[in-house]
Amino acid sequence: MDVPEEVEKHIKITEEELSSAYLLLENGKLRDSISRAYYSMFHAAKALLLLKGIDPRKHSGVIRMFGLHFVNSGFIERVYAKYLTHSRSDQRLTMMSITNQVMRKLKTLLKVLSASWRELKVFWRRLKMDKKAQALNEFLKL
């Protein structure tokens, strides 16, 4: 599978996981919702890394490389890296119990994730439509 196909695959998974997270939350399936929210963010981060030719194999590598290449460069706000890191921790915690604090964090996380997902989709569409690959070249220079 070449890079654009792999990126498309992760974008599709991101969209599916985000949709599932909302549906599960609306139906009171909190643990599953937190897990799906985390995987949505994970696959979005993985897609961005693949665009730069970076392919970490572990979740910890995706989180670390996402921070290094996108947050530290200023391309993505630091708060998004925190959401990704915290959602991974929350996902692990929810296997034990659900608290009101986790529930509030999840609702906030889903709102932020929806906004950042819309931004990623707009960026990806622009990237695909640019026949001269100017957007890709600018992106890779970050």
Curated annotation (Swiss-Prot):
Classification via Pfam families: HEPN
Tree of life domain: Archaea
Coiled coil: none
InterPro entries: HEPN_dom (IPR007842), UPF0332_toxin (IPR052226)
Family of the protein in this entry: Belongs to the UPF0332 family.
Protein name in UniProt: UPF0332 protein PH1297
Species the sequence originates in: Pyrococcus horikoshii (strain ATCC 700860 / DSM 12428 / JCM 9974 / NBRC 100139 / OT-3)
